[in-house]
Design a protein with these regions (language model features):
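A short, structure-level motif marking secondary-structure boundaries and short turns
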Residues: 7, 29, 100-102
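Active-site cofactor/cluster-binding pocket
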Residues: 63-101, 107-301
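Short conserved micro-motifs on helix faces and helix-strand junctions that flank
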Residues: 15, 102-103
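Active-site lining segments that contact anionic ligands and/or coordinate catalytic metals
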Residues: 4, 21-23, 37-39, 50, ...
Length: 301
Protein backbone atom coordinates (compact mmCIF):
# COMPACT_ATOMS: atom_id res chain seq x y z
CA UNK A 1 0.00 0.00 0.00
CA UNK A 2 1.00 3.59 -0.58
CA UNK A 3 2.37 5.01 2.71
CA UNK A 4 0.27 7.93 3.95
CA UNK A 5 3.33 10.01 4.69
CA UNK A 6 5.13 12.61 2.61
CA UNK A 7 8.23 14.70 3.07
CA UNK A 8 8.55 18.34 2.06
CA UNK A 9 11.41 20.83 2.29
CA UNK A 10 10.78 24.32 3.65
CA UNK A 11 12.41 26.77 1.25
CA UNK A 12 12.71 29.34 4.04
CA UNK A 13 14.82 27.01 6.19
CA UNK A 14 16.80 25.12 3.54
CA UNK A 15 20.40 26.32 3.19
CA UNK A 16 21.05 24.46 -0.05
CA UNK A 17 23.86 22.33 1.34
CA UNK A 18 22.75 19.23 -0.56
CA UNK A 19 23.16 16.82 2.35
CA UNK A 20 19.71 15.37 1.61
CA UNK A 21 21.00 14.36 -1.83
CA UNK A 22 24.13 12.88 -0.29
CA UNK A 23 22.12 10.84 2.20
CA UNK A 24 19.59 9.52 -0.29
CA UNK A 25 21.31 9.63 -3.69
CA UNK A 26 17.77 10.24 -4.93
CA UNK A 27 16.90 12.16 -8.08
CA UNK A 28 13.54 13.12 -6.62
CA UNK A 29 15.45 15.65 -4.52
CA UNK A 30 15.59 18.46 -7.03
CA UNK A 31 17.16 21.94 -7.19
CA UNK A 32 14.94 24.95 -6.59
CA UNK A 33 16.36 28.25 -7.81
CA UNK A 34 15.30 31.14 -5.55
CA UNK A 35 16.30 34.82 -5.11
CA UNK A 36 18.39 33.61 -2.16
CA UNK A 37 20.23 30.99 -4.17
CA UNK A 38 19.72 27.34 -4.96
CA UNK A 39 17.58 25.44 -2.47
CA UNK A 40 16.21 21.91 -2.51
CA UNK A 41 12.74 20.50 -3.02
CA UNK A 42 11.13 17.10 -3.45
CA UNK A 43 9.44 16.18 -6.71
CA UNK A 44 6.28 14.67 -5.27
CA UNK A 45 5.37 13.14 -8.64
CA UNK A 46 8.57 11.08 -8.70
CA UNK A 47 9.16 10.40 -4.98
CA UNK A 48 9.20 6.67 -4.16
CA UNK A 49 8.77 7.32 -0.42
CA UNK A 50 11.80 5.51 0.94
CA UNK A 51 12.39 8.56 3.17
CA UNK A 52 16.18 8.23 3.07
CA UNK A 53 16.57 11.95 2.34
CA UNK A 54 15.48 12.81 5.89
CA UNK A 55 18.29 10.81 7.47
CA UNK A 56 20.49 13.89 7.60
CA UNK A 57 18.19 15.29 10.33
CA UNK A 58 17.89 18.60 8.50
CA UNK A 59 15.55 21.13 10.16
CA UNK A 60 14.15 22.17 6.77
CA UNK A 61 12.28 18.86 6.38
CA UNK A 62 8.57 18.76 7.10
CA UNK A 63 6.81 15.40 7.50
CA UNK A 64 3.10 15.27 6.69
CA UNK A 65 1.07 12.28 7.88
CA UNK A 66 -2.27 11.38 6.31
CA UNK A 67 -2.40 14.31 3.90
CA UNK A 68 -2.29 14.34 0.13
CA UNK A 69 -0.58 16.64 -2.32
CA UNK A 70 -2.79 19.48 -3.44
CA UNK A 71 -3.14 19.27 -7.19
CA UNK A 72 -3.65 22.22 -9.47
CA UNK A 73 -7.08 22.28 -11.04
CA UNK A 74 -7.58 20.87 -14.52
CA UNK A 75 -9.94 23.67 -15.56
CA UNK A 76 -7.55 26.61 -15.51
CA UNK A 77 -7.42 26.62 -19.31
CA UNK A 78 -10.85 27.63 -20.67
CA UNK A 79 -12.59 24.72 -22.35
CA UNK A 80 -13.39 26.85 -25.39
CA UNK A 81 -9.65 27.18 -26.07
CA UNK A 82 -9.19 23.42 -26.04
CA UNK A 83 -12.21 22.95 -28.28
CA UNK A 84 -10.95 25.57 -30.75
CA UNK A 85 -7.57 23.94 -31.41
CA UNK A 86 -7.15 23.72 -35.20
CA UNK A 87 -6.53 20.42 -36.93
CA UNK A 88 -2.87 19.43 -36.71
CA UNK A 89 -0.50 19.47 -39.63
CA UNK A 90 -0.29 16.06 -41.25
CA UNK A 91 3.11 15.02 -42.58
CA UNK A 92 3.45 13.80 -46.13
CA UNK A 93 4.30 10.12 -45.78
CA UNK A 94 5.89 8.18 -48.64
CA UNK A 95 7.94 5.82 -46.47
CA UNK A 96 7.88 4.09 -43.10
CA UNK A 97 7.61 6.82 -40.44
CA UNK A 98 10.39 6.40 -37.87
CA UNK A 99 10.16 7.89 -34.40
CA UNK A 100 12.70 7.76 -31.58
CA UNK A 101 11.29 8.60 -28.16
CA UNK A 102 13.98 9.59 -25.65
CA UNK A 103 13.34 9.95 -21.94
CA UNK A 104 14.03 8.60 -18.47
CA UNK A 105 12.76 5.50 -16.74
CA UNK A 106 9.67 5.76 -14.60
CA UNK A 107 8.05 8.55 -16.61
CA UNK A 108 6.14 6.50 -19.18
CA UNK A 109 8.47 6.48 -22.20
CA UNK A 110 7.68 2.84 -23.00
CA UNK A 111 3.97 3.58 -22.52
CA UNK A 112 4.17 6.41 -25.07
CA UNK A 113 5.58 4.02 -27.65
CA UNK A 114 2.79 1.54 -26.92
CA UNK A 115 0.07 4.22 -27.11
CA UNK A 116 1.32 5.54 -30.44
CA UNK A 117 1.63 2.00 -31.77
CA UNK A 118 -1.97 1.32 -30.77
CA UNK A 119 -3.08 4.57 -32.43
CA UNK A 120 -1.47 3.39 -35.67
CA UNK A 121 -3.19 0.02 -35.31
CA UNK A 122 -6.56 1.76 -34.90
CA UNK A 123 -5.94 3.43 -38.28
CA UNK A 124 -5.21 0.02 -39.86
CA UNK A 125 -1.55 0.88 -40.17
CA UNK A 126 1.33 -1.32 -39.16
CA UNK A 127 3.40 -0.45 -36.11
CA UNK A 128 6.61 -1.90 -34.75
CA UNK A 129 7.95 -0.90 -31.34
CA UNK A 130 11.40 -1.64 -29.94
CA UNK A 131 12.16 -0.51 -26.38
CA UNK A 132 15.72 0.04 -25.18
CA UNK A 133 15.72 0.03 -21.39
CA UNK A 134 19.10 -1.66 -21.01
CA UNK A 135 20.13 -1.78 -17.36
CA UNK A 136 18.36 1.48 -16.56
CA UNK A 137 15.99 1.67 -13.65
CA UNK A 138 13.95 4.64 -12.53
CA UNK A 139 15.57 7.87 -13.79
CA UNK A 140 17.90 6.03 -16.20
CA UNK A 141 17.85 6.75 -19.94
CA UNK A 142 15.16 4.86 -21.87
CA UNK A 143 14.53 4.87 -25.63
CA UNK A 144 11.52 3.61 -27.54
CA UNK A 145 11.91 3.02 -31.28
CA UNK A 146 8.66 3.23 -33.23
CA UNK A 147 7.94 2.68 -36.90
CA UNK A 148 4.54 3.47 -38.37
CA UNK A 149 3.94 1.62 -41.61
CA UNK A 150 1.18 2.24 -44.14
CA UNK A 151 1.23 -1.37 -45.32
CA UNK A 152 1.58 -3.81 -42.39
CA UNK A 153 2.72 -6.55 -44.78
CA UNK A 154 5.96 -4.67 -45.46
CA UNK A 155 6.91 -4.39 -41.79
CA UNK A 156 10.61 -4.82 -41.04
CA UNK A 157 12.87 -4.06 -38.09
CA UNK A 158 11.62 -1.51 -35.58
CA UNK A 159 15.12 -0.21 -34.92
CA UNK A 160 15.59 3.43 -35.97
CA UNK A 161 19.02 3.40 -37.53
CA UNK A 162 21.62 5.96 -38.50
CA UNK A 163 19.91 9.09 -39.84
CA UNK A 164 16.55 7.31 -40.13
CA UNK A 165 14.42 9.27 -37.66
CA UNK A 166 11.57 11.36 -39.00
CA UNK A 167 10.85 12.52 -35.46
CA UNK A 168 13.05 12.64 -32.39
CA UNK A 169 10.59 13.08 -29.54
CA UNK A 170 12.76 14.24 -26.66
CA UNK A 171 10.87 13.85 -23.40
CA UNK A 172 14.15 14.47 -21.59
CA UNK A 173 16.82 16.87 -22.84
CA UNK A 174 19.82 14.93 -21.51
CA UNK A 175 18.63 11.64 -23.02
CA UNK A 176 18.00 13.41 -26.32
CA UNK A 177 21.62 14.51 -26.77
CA UNK A 178 23.09 11.08 -26.00
CA UNK A 179 24.92 9.44 -28.94
CA UNK A 180 22.25 6.74 -29.29
CA UNK A 181 19.70 9.48 -30.02
CA UNK A 182 21.81 11.93 -32.01
CA UNK A 183 22.93 9.22 -34.43
CA UNK A 184 19.35 8.88 -35.71
CA UNK A 185 19.18 12.54 -36.81
CA UNK A 186 19.35 13.51 -40.48
CA UNK A 187 19.27 17.31 -40.96
CA UNK A 188 17.29 16.87 -44.18
CA UNK A 189 14.71 14.56 -42.63
CA UNK A 190 14.46 14.66 -38.85
CA UNK A 191 12.12 16.92 -36.90
CA UNK A 192 13.24 17.32 -33.28
CA UNK A 193 10.62 18.11 -30.63
CA UNK A 194 12.13 18.33 -27.17
CA UNK A 195 11.20 19.09 -23.58
CA UNK A 196 13.54 21.94 -22.69
CA UNK A 197 13.08 21.53 -18.92
CA UNK A 198 16.38 20.10 -17.71
CA UNK A 199 16.19 17.22 -15.25
CA UNK A 200 19.02 16.96 -12.74
CA UNK A 201 21.36 14.06 -13.48
CA UNK A 202 23.03 11.73 -10.92
CA UNK A 203 26.05 14.04 -10.95
CA UNK A 204 23.91 16.60 -9.12
CA UNK A 205 23.93 14.33 -6.06
CA UNK A 206 27.70 14.71 -5.65
CA UNK A 207 28.05 18.20 -7.16
CA UNK A 208 25.20 20.24 -5.65
CA UNK A 209 26.34 23.48 -7.30
CA UNK A 210 26.75 22.09 -10.81
CA UNK A 211 25.51 24.16 -13.76
CA UNK A 212 22.01 23.03 -14.71
CA UNK A 213 21.62 25.30 -17.72
CA UNK A 214 20.18 23.38 -20.66
CA UNK A 215 20.96 25.97 -23.32
CA UNK A 216 24.15 24.26 -24.46
CA UNK A 217 22.40 20.90 -24.78
CA UNK A 218 19.64 22.47 -26.85
CA UNK A 219 22.23 24.15 -29.05
CA UNK A 220 23.86 20.76 -29.57
CA UNK A 221 20.62 19.41 -30.98
CA UNK A 222 20.26 22.47 -33.19
CA UNK A 223 23.81 21.98 -34.49
CA UNK A 224 23.03 18.39 -35.46
CA UNK A 225 19.65 18.93 -37.08
CA UNK A 226 19.47 22.63 -37.92
CA UNK A 227 17.82 25.41 -35.94
CA UNK A 228 14.63 25.31 -38.00
CA UNK A 229 14.19 21.60 -37.35
CA UNK A 230 14.12 21.90 -33.55
CA UNK A 231 11.06 22.85 -31.51
CA UNK A 232 11.36 23.09 -27.75
CA UNK A 233 8.82 23.60 -24.99
CA UNK A 234 8.99 23.65 -21.18
CA UNK A 235 6.70 20.62 -20.96
CA UNK A 236 7.51 19.64 -17.38
CA UNK A 237 6.92 23.14 -16.04
CA UNK A 238 3.68 23.59 -17.98
CA UNK A 239 2.38 20.14 -17.03
CA UNK A 240 3.07 20.76 -13.35
CA UNK A 241 1.42 24.18 -13.49
CA UNK A 242 -1.72 23.08 -15.33
CA UNK A 243 -2.21 19.47 -14.23
CA UNK A 244 -0.47 19.47 -10.86
CA UNK A 245 1.77 16.53 -11.79
CA UNK A 246 5.03 16.36 -13.75
CA UNK A 247 4.09 12.90 -15.02
CA UNK A 248 1.78 14.62 -17.52
CA UNK A 249 4.76 16.07 -19.38
CA UNK A 250 5.27 13.12 -21.71
CA UNK A 251 1.64 12.95 -22.84
CA UNK A 252 1.85 16.73 -23.28
CA UNK A 253 4.81 16.12 -25.61
CA UNK A 254 2.76 13.74 -27.76
CA UNK A 255 0.16 16.45 -28.31
CA UNK A 256 2.82 19.07 -29.01
CA UNK A 257 4.59 16.90 -31.60
CA UNK A 258 1.34 15.79 -33.25
CA UNK A 259 0.12 19.37 -33.64
CA UNK A 260 3.40 20.38 -35.30
CA UNK A 261 3.11 17.61 -37.87
CA UNK A 262 5.57 15.18 -36.35
CA UNK A 263 3.24 12.17 -36.31
CA UNK A 264 1.14 10.71 -39.16
CA UNK A 265 -1.73 9.95 -36.78
CA UNK A 266 -5.13 11.49 -36.14
CA UNK A 267 -6.12 13.17 -32.89
CA UNK A 268 -9.02 10.77 -32.51
CA UNK A 269 -6.87 7.65 -32.78
CA UNK A 270 -4.36 8.89 -30.21
CA UNK A 271 -7.08 9.82 -27.72
CA UNK A 272 -8.74 6.44 -28.26
CA UNK A 273 -5.39 4.72 -27.67
CA UNK A 274 -5.04 6.64 -24.39
CA UNK A 275 -8.48 5.41 -23.40
CA UNK A 276 -7.56 1.81 -24.22
CA UNK A 277 -4.41 2.11 -22.12
CA UNK A 278 -6.79 2.60 -19.21
CA UNK A 279 -4.52 4.57 -16.86
CA UNK A 280 -5.52 8.07 -15.68
CA UNK A 281 -7.47 8.46 -18.91
CA UNK A 282 -8.97 11.93 -18.37
CA UNK A 283 -5.73 13.27 -16.94
CA UNK A 284 -3.69 12.07 -19.93
CA UNK A 285 -6.20 13.23 -22.54
CA UNK A 286 -6.19 16.65 -20.88
CA UNK A 287 -2.37 16.76 -20.93
CA UNK A 288 -2.41 15.67 -24.60
CA UNK A 289 -4.79 18.50 -25.48
CA UNK A 290 -2.70 21.01 -23.55
CA UNK A 291 0.29 19.97 -25.66
CA UNK A 292 -1.69 20.59 -28.83
CA UNK A 293 -2.77 23.99 -27.50
CA UNK A 294 0.82 24.91 -26.63
CA UNK A 295 1.88 24.20 -30.21
CA UNK A 296 -1.01 26.03 -31.88
CA UNK A 297 -1.52 28.92 -29.45
CA UNK A 298 1.38 29.20 -26.99
CA UNK A 299 0.20 32.58 -25.70
CA UNK A 300 -2.90 30.87 -24.29
CA UNK A 301 -0.73 29.15 -21.70
Amino acid sequence: PDPQKRLFISQEVCEGCGDCSTQSNCLSVVPKETPLGRKRGIDQSACNKDYSCVEGFCPSFVTVHGGGVKRAGMTEVPMELLQAIPAPKFPSVDHDWSVLIAGVGGTGVVTIGAVLGMAAHLENKGAAVFDMTGVSQKNGAVYSHLKIIEDPDTMSSADVGLGEADLLLGCDLVASVAPVAVRTIDPNRTRVVVNETLTATPQFQSSPNMNLEGGLLLKGLQDHSGVNQVSSVAATRIALSLTGDTIGANTFMIGYALQLGGLPLSVESVERAIELNGVAVQFNIHAFRLGRLAASNPDAL
